[in-house]
Structures are given as structure tokens and as C-alpha cells.
Amino acid sequence: MLGRHFLTLACAVAIAIAAPYTVTAATPPDQLVIAVNMSSMRGLDPHELNQFESAEVVANLYERLIVLPADKINEPQPGLAESWTISEDGKTFTFKIRSGVTFHSGNALTAKDVEWSLRRLVKHGLAPSTDLRQWGFSADNVDSLIRATDDQTLVLETPEVWNADLILLSLASFSTSILDSTFLADKAKNDDMGREFLQTADAGSGPYSLRSWRANELLIAEAYADYWQGEPAMRRVILRHLPESSAQRLQIEAGDMDVATRLSSTDLSALEAGGNVQIQKTPGFGFYYLALNQKDEILSNPKVREAFRYLIDYDGLSSTVMKYYGIKQQTIIPGGLAGASTENPYKLDIDKAKQLLTEAGYADGFSKIYFATPVTPEYEVAQSLQANAAKAGIKLDLQGGDHIGKFRERAFEIFSARSGERLPDPHAVLASYATNANNADDAKLTGLLAWRSAWDVPKEIQDMVLAAAHETDKAKRNDLYAKINKVYLESSPALITSFQRTDAKAVRNDVKGYTGHSTWLTRWDTVTKGD
């Protein structure tokens, strides 16, 4: 239970940052205050969450075996694993676990905690478990394949040979965060391995520990004094729920916030012109996408799917809503990765869409319910599509709200959002968008966007994706990805990509070392303040 002193402190912080916008006040020099939209933050269990804002929190509460520096995103570096070796057959990875690391509880971190954490991720079987399950790990085999041989040694064996980089990159994802197994043993309820407890608490070894979180209001994290890399300069990090872009803009202009996220392009432009903040645009490896449920008779028609590609105003959105948030891209491999293409053959063409709808037998159009994430810029993109679809005779009943659960359960007609892949490798996107080994409802492959969309991906595409993941020859792998890009584009996919994701944030000029991360692992312990 929190002490009386901390509760008083938390209340004081909450009151201070809720001050009227008209009062200009700099944030304390040893505190970082971030404005976020918490509406999609549902919990902080790293083996359960799959959400942008939550991931940044987890990146600082926990640590992982491997580190991917923001400026060297494709180069795995030592984290909790100070070194590793790979067997000649490419199937056995042996990690030497760093000594002298302690959890926030004071418990020493050992290979046993790593073993328990990675097994827990797989056994939970939730969406983030895809990061390990895709390599053949399952609840049935994980105990024999991932094991601690002593306090400082972890052995991980893969059932098959994969490109080694894929395994290492997976172990850098926030989903593979290492938890304090001894501490959580006392917090478990009904064999949940601490799942309920971790919704609002932490059991990590990261540079910050969680002190308070009130959903859709306030989150406070405090520097961990015994952090193995040294106590962070920012004594406290505060996340405040400010869903409105205009409110975020006013507060960062006034100096009441250090970092603002989820700002509209209009507000970002104004802040950039003001000179007191810098706009960070961090390239991501995900997309803004439109999902058409293939269990729906109308939407499963290839010509209908193709028609939707002509109802997106790629160029108009690029210069307005998406100016800071995305780069036009209609192919499936993100720019900057092997096999990426600059080909963008589609443009807004209402007449072409009408022609395709007529050929499909829907000359008079149809009506569908359209779920869209109610945040910037996703909702503005959805409104644009709704308006263009109406011109082609399609009535879209646009509904905001938190519909991600319905999407996971295939209980939707049309859904749009943005994805953010955690591995800087083409396979991360392709595994989700272009593989679906079992399209049955009871398969519950919820980590795959293709399964959620009930899309039975053409076998040719799935076979190539699998072959590329196994391929160890770089040139051959690149050739496969280039071919996949072409075939996917020509398949009238149920998952339509329109923009490669870019994450835009406004950061005040006196804040140094706050660096956006392409795989959602932005760190706070690198932050300092000063002119």
C-alpha cells in the first residue's frame, strides 16, 4: 500500500499539472511531464499489452535480454544478456545473464527469472506471445526449450532453424520483458502468474518503477536509485491524460508539459512555427490500415476490396492530416527494410471504385458499420474514407470507441487503425498481414491481423513469407521479399495499407535525450534538461 507521504505527493502533483492554461510555469528540472491519450491503455502487463503508450511505460519499468538503440535499430546490443553465442546448426542460443542487476523489489535478477518470464509469455498465449510462438514455441514445449542451466546462463533452443537475427530481434521486444518471478509468486491469484496484479503495478528492473496509475487520468513513475546503469537524471516521470490535441498544444506552449503526443497536424505545424519546441518524426515499421472482414459476403468479393483502394485520398491526406504522421505507401514491406518498394499505383478515383462495385454486382452500393480508433490521425483518415465512400454509394456508419476487442474476436465489418511492428525486419509485418495458418474461428490467432480479418491468405504468399524467414542468405532473402511485395499488392488484400506509420511528438527545446524509438521503446533514463 502506498504511504501517506506518497499519496500527499501524488495529489500535489495532480493538482499542479491540472493548473489553468493561462498560468505559464516551467516543469521542475528533475521531472519529465508527458501529455498522452490514455484511452487505449488497458493494463501494464508486458506479456499482455499491445499498445503504443503502454509500451513506452513498460520499456522503462522493465528490461530485456537484447537492446535495439534508437539510432542503430537493426543492430542488436547487449541488455540483460551481456553476451551470447549461437550453435553451428543455428538452433541453440546461449545467453550469459548480466550479474549485479536487481529488481525494484530488491531481488537479484537471475537466469531463472528470464526462464520464468519467457515461459510465462508463451503460456499466457495472448497477442504479444506471437513474438515467440511464431518460432515454434508453445505451452507444451517451452519448458524444455527455454531453460536456465545456472543463475547466469539461459539456453534457448528453437524447434527449427530460423534467420538468427529474427530470434535476437524478438528478444528486444517489450513483450519479452523480464519479470521478478519471486516477487510475483506472492502476488499470483488462481495461477494467473501475477496477471491481475500487473495491470496496475510493476515487477521490473528498469530505470523507473511505477508509483501510481489512475486510468484515463495520471501515471507517475519514479527513478530507481539502484538501477544498474546509474540513477536517472529525471527523478520523476509523469504522464497526464490529455486526449484533446488543442489542450496538449496549449500546455506545452505554456511550459506545463515537456512532451506532447497525439497532436493534430494543424497543432504540430503551429508548434513548429513557434520555435519553443522541436517536432520529432520517428519512422515506424507499421501501417495505417483498413481491415475488411472476409466473413462478410460483400467484403469478401475481390472487386469490392479493390474498390476500397480507390476510395482513399492518399495525396490529399499526405499534405494535411498525415503530414507528420505517415508516408504514403501501398505495398506491404515498410520503407527502410529489405525488399521495400516505392511503387504506389493507387489514387483517389471515385469513378473507378464505382466501376469495380458494378462489376462485383453492387452498382447501388451497400451499408456497413465502420469501427475506427477515435484518436488523431486515425479518426480523421476514417472520416475522409467515409465521405469518399458515400460518393461511390457506400454508406459507412462510422463509430468511434475502443473496438479493438471486437476486431480481435472478428466481430466487426470494417475496422481501421494503425499497427506498430516490434521487429525491424520485414517478417514482423508479413507474419501479421500475410500469414494465417488456420483461418478457423477457434484457432484464435489473435496476434495476426490476417486472422482477425478472417482472410485466408493465398498459399503462394504464405509459403514465400515462411521461406524468407528461414533463409540465411541475405541476397536470396531480399529477392523473396521483393517478390512478396509485388504478389501481395496484386492480390486485392483484405488488409489495405495506405501510409507507413510515423510517430510525431512535440518536445520542448530544453528537454535533451528524449528520442523516439521505431519499436516503441523510448527511454526516459537518457533525458536531461537544460539550455
Predicted segment positions?
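Gly/Pro-rich hinge or "lid" segments in bacterial periplasmic/extracellular proteins
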Residues: 70, 170-232, 236, 350-351, ...
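Detector for C-terminal structural segments
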Residues: 56, 214, 218, 311-340, ...
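Ligand-site clamp/hinge motif
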Residues: 196, 224-270, 395
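Alpha-helical secondary-structure segments
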Residues: 33, 110-117, 151-157, 161, ...
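Surface-exposed binding/hinge segments that line
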Residues: 21, 96, 133-186
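A structural "hinge/loop" feature
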Residues: 38-55, 77-80, 107, 131, ...
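Aromatic- and charge-enriched surface segment that lines or borders ligand/interaction sites
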Residues: 82-130, 149, 155-157, 165, ...
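N-terminal lobe/hinge region of extracytoplasmic solute-binding protein
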Residues: 35-88, 119, 201-207
